[in-house]
């Protein structure tokens, strides 16, 4: 069994953050490509209804991701805290709970989506023209649901014991397999791709995209299982260690639920902003879609760094090494602020060129330039909020994490979007996310200072006793 906890215990803070964050950030970069792959390759068929079908089913796919985050992010935080407390037996119970709960939830979702496929798809926006394609996509993705949920869960869970590199490799392997298989299953033999003729292809269209996605996740799960079976991990996949009581389920779900809700709210907020933008024409909708893709680079990189440092915070909190924990959080915030500032400056200088990468329509580009600059206003500081939110998760502070998750994409953002649209119009829609991000960043700093003050008071009371 390999001891990965030395990165938490003995590495300097900069080295520990680098060791944990870089693999997570690399995984996020590949994830950006992965998120665009299905839409890109389905788009090569020239069938707009197939492309629309993939978009329609995206909220349902994000539901699988949310369930994976429920057990993965929650399990990661609970595992790292338990390791810091020296409770290795509890770590094995936590990991077993997460593994088999994820499989169970995945199986339930398989049954539900296969049985209620038609009403579910029409509820999320399928039309008569797109239903058949969306139904094909959902059928295969639903069958693979246990693997999709488990892949997301395992990629997060192993980070809890410091195996950031293993998490990165397992996730990237699955994503690369998906990207490689996409054109093979989607396109026909003889179709053109990047100016070249496809030497083979099954021509299954949108169903092929779903099959490639499932196979990629199966490969990822197999990789993690091999990691466990080779005795490289302190985590356990033994069904005999599965427990719900003893604070196990509560400890996982308290932290995992905010992460799951955040995934769902991101999907809902994207749908809502498109509904508002429809009043201003298709060019505005297209420009916002492009802006979101461009903004994905800074958000994913900053999320990757924040996600990487979460188990370090959890371990230090569990081991009562509060000075090291605060140092780790401060250093990570500074790194994200520098990263966000650099990318923001580059985007402001080359805004038109960035938007033009995605489209050559002048009207859409004009909208996109305005939208990207507005969205990037929060770029330098939003990474600080990500670090603090993941730090709350690492410390097991589910309430604070829940407040931030609900606020950024819900409680603050939705009212702002509605009010600013009514009072300012299109500019209000464009600026609403940046304003919400700035407000939530300020909230996260205040909440963190309150948590630190409480921890100091508790520590001084223990010292006096």
Where do the language-model regions lie?
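Transmembrane helical elements of multi-pass membrane transporters/channels
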Residues: 19-38, 140, 174, 216-220, ...
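Small-residue-rich hydrophobic transmembrane alpha-helices
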Residues: 51-111, 148-167, 287-351, 382-404
């Amino acid at each position: 069994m390999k001891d990965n906890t030395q990165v938490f215990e003995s590495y300097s803070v900069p080295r520990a953050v680098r060791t944990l964050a870089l693999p997570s950030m690399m995984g996020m970069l590949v994830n950006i490509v992965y998120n665009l792959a299905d839409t890109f390759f389905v788009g090569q068929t020239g069938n707009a209804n197939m492309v629309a079908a993939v978009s329609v089913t995206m909220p349902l796919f994000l539901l699988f991701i949310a369930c994976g985050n429920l057990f993965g992010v929650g399990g990661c935080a609970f595992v790292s805290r338990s390791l810091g407390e020296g409770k290795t037996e509890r770590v094995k119970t936590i990991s077993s709970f997460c593994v088999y709960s994820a499989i169970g939830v995945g199986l339930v979702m398989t049954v539900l989506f296969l049985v209620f496929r038609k009403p579910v798809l029409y509820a999320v926006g399928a039309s008569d023209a797109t239903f058949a394609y969306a139904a094909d996509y959902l059928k295969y993705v639903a069958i693979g649901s246990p693997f999709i949920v488990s892949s997301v869960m395992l990629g997060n869970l192993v980070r809890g014991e410091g195996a950031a590199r293993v998490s990165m490799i397992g996730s990237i392997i699955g994503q690369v397999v998906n990207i490689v298989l996409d054109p093979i299953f989607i396109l026909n033999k003889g179709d053109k791709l990047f100016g070249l003729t496809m030497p083979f292809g099954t021509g299954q269209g949108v169903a092929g995209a779903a099959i490639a996605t499932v196979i990629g996740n199966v490969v990822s799960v197999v990789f993690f299982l091999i990691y466990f079976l080779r005795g490289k991990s302190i985590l356990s996949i033994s069904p005999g260690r599965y427990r719900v009581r003893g604070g196990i389920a509560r400890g996982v779900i308290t932290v995992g639920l905010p992460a799951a809700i955040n995934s769902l709210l991101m999907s809902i907020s994207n749908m809502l902003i498109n509904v508002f933008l429809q009043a201003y024409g298709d060019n505005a909708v297209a420009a916002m879609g492009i802006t979101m893709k461009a903004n994905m680079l800074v958000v994913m990189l900053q999320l990757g760094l924040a996600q990487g440092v979460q188990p370090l915070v959890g371990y230090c909190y569990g081991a009562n090494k509060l000075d090291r924990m605060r140092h780790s959080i401060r250093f990570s915030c500074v790194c994200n602020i520098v990263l966000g500032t650099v990318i923001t400056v580059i985007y402001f200088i080359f805004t038109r060129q960035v938007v033009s990468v995605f489209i050559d329509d002048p009207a859409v580009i004009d909208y996109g330039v305005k939208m990207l600059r507005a969205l990037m206003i929060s770029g330098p500081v939003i990474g600080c909020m990500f670090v603090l939110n993941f730090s709350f998760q690492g410390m097991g502070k589910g309430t604070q994490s829940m407040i931030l998750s609900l606020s950024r994409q819900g409680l603050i953002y939705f009212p702002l979007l509605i009010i600013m649209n009514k009072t300012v119009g299109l500019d209000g829609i464009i600026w609403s996310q940046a304003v919400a991000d700035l407000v939530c960043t300020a909230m996260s700093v205040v909440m963190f200072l309150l948590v630190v003050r409480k921890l100091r008071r508790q520590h001084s009371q223990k010292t006096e006793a």
